[in-house]
């Protein structure tokens, strides 16, 4: 399994478990490896929204849509 996949899996698991700060850390590390992935930007946005950081979440959703305008999950 690649480092990127491990980071994403850890992020998703922590997000589902309510460990939002840890999830955010994993998604941010994954974005360092693949900054052009709209799904990662969306996951980061979901995590930030869960933390109540709505403005930052909105920016992540916008970035996701810039990368893939067809991504309805970000809209």
Stretches with model-predicted labels:
Residues 5, 39, 73-74:
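Start-of-helix register in tetratricopeptide repeats
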Residues 29-32, 62-66:
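Conserved structural position within tetratricopeptide repeats
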């Amino acid at each position: 399994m690649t480092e990127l996949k491990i980071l994403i899996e850890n992020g998703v698991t922590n997000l589902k478990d309510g460990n939002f700060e840890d999830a955010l850390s994993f998604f941010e590390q994954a974005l360092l490896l693949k900054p052009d992935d709209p799904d990662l930007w969306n996951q980061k946005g979901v995590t930030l929204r869960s933390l109540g950081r709505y403005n930052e979440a909105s920016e992540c959703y916008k970035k996701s849509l810039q990368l893939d305008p067809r991504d309805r999950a970000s809209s």
